[in-house]
């Protein structure tokens, strides 16, 4: 666990921001501001920090657990999309239409209902009004912990093992959207990106630091990169002789991604961009230059990006030379609960669904 970096010069602004956040939460807690309830069970997957907890892989984990048995819909804001209003995603929807994360989910689960709308209540109302045979039996609210206009039946909050929540600071000095104590609104907390060698003393330290109530269940998850590389533009698999890679990441916390890439491909170049980054023409040109330089040294060199970046880079296919397209891959990531916690986790989810039947 690492202590977060805090910009001490911005602490006065964080104090002002905190006043506004606490007032808003107080008004919701006292029912001055109203949270809307719905007939369909809603599971919210959110966080208290600004990104970096692995939210989308955890949403996909819920889908894998429940979608075979229940009609599941995902409602998301559609961050950084270029459209407005409510959009029901189709297989042809792009990252510009619905955002990179909803596009990633829809691409993996084409028969899943995915809706993007800044007004999450409107999107959920639309789903509730569908005919019974189309109406979802469960709604996963993506990144909705601060969207208190919707009353979720189960709030799951994610927090990064590598960034101690209780030692972080409110925006803009730190990365907290709201005070760390707000985690007490959660029903379940998942400590994400845990190392494989997590020891009992680490578990006790995490429980102590988070100071959860007895009714709040704490889970531990880790990232898995076992699927292998997927081609982005072609159908060619990488050669077994590949030792070099140009690695591209525009996500909030790319450390685990780069560590995995360098474990597989020891040499190459790493390029880091902001989360949800929209690549400019100049940046694409620089990536092409990086590729040519690497390819001159190693004829088998490849390009690898994160799965989320692939949703945006796919829109720039024509900008890349053909030879680079044929060696362009992305690395999917999945999550797994540790310490045989999956049954307890699933039972809690099923309890929420059964309660509203």
Curated annotation (Swiss-Prot):
GO terms for biological process: lipid A biosynthetic process; lipopolysaccharide core region biosynthetic process. ATP binds at residues 49-56. Pathway: Glycolipid biosynthesis; lipid IV(A) biosynthesis; lipid IV(A) from (3R)-3-hydroxytetradecanoyl-[acyl-carrier-protein] and UDP-N-acetyl-alpha-D-glucosamine: step 6/6. Signal peptide: none annotated. GO terms for molecular function: ATP binding; tetraacyldisaccharide 4'-kinase activity. It comes from the Bacteria. The keyword ATP-binding applies. SUPFAM superfamilies: P-loop containing nucleoside triphosphate hydrolases. Keywords: ATP-binding, Kinase, Lipid A biosynthesis, Lipid biosynthesis, Lipid metabolism, Nucleotide-binding, Transferase. One of its GO terms (cellular component) is plasma membrane. The keyword Kinase applies. It catalyses: a lipid A disaccharide + ATP = a lipid IVA + ADP + H(+). Its EC number is 2.7.1.130. Transfers the gamma-phosphate of ATP to the 4'-position of a tetraacyldisaccharide 1-phosphate intermediate (termed DS-1-P) to form tetraacyldisaccharide 1,4'-bis-phosphate (lipid IVA). Belongs to the LpxK family. This is Tetraacyldisaccharide 4'-kinase.
């Amino acid at each position: 666990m690492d202590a977060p970096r805090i910009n001490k010069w911005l602490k006065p602004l964080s104090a002002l921001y905190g006043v506004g956040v606490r007032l808003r939460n107080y008004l919701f807690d006292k029912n001055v501001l109203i949270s809307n309830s719905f007939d369909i069970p809603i599971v919210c997957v959110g966080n208290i920090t600004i990104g970096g907890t692995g939210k989308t892989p955890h949403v996909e984990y819920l889908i894998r657990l429940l979608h075979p048995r229940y009609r599941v819909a995902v409602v998301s804001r559609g961050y950084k999309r270029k459209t407005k209003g409510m959009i029901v995603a189709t297989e042809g929807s792009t990252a510009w239409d619905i955002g990179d994360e909803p596009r990633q989910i829809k691409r993996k689960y084409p028969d899943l209902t995915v809706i993007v709308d800044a007004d999450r209540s409107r999107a959920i109302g639309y789903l509730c009004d569908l005919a019974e045979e189309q109406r979802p039996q469960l709604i996963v609210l993506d990144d909705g912990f601060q969207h208190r206009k919707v009353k979720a039946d189960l709030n799951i909050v994610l927090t990064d093992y590598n960034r101690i929540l209780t030692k972080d600071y409110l925006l803009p000095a730190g990365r907290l959207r709201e005070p760390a104590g707000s985690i007490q609104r959660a029903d379940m907390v998942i400590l994400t990106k845990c190392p494989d060698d997590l020891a009992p003393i680490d578990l006790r330290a995490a429980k102590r630091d988070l100071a959860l109530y007895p009714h709040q269940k704490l889970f531990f998850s880790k990232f898995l990169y076992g699927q292998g590389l997927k081609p982005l533009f072609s159908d060619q698999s990488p050669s077994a002789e590949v030792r070099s890679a140009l690695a591209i990441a525009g996500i909030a916390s790319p450390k685990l991604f780069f560590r995995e890439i360098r474990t597989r491909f020891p040499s190459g170049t790493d390029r880091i961009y902001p989360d949800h980054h929209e690549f400019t023409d100049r940046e694409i040109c620089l990536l092409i230059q990086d590729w040519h330089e690497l390819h001159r040294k190693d004829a088998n060199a490849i390009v690898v990006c994160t799965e989320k970046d692939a949703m945006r880079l796919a829109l720039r296919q024509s900008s890349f030379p053909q030879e680079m397209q044929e060696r362009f891959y992305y690395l999917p990531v999945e999550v797994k609960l540790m310490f045989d916690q999956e049954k307890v986790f699933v039972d809690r989810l099923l309890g929420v669904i059964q309660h509203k039947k």
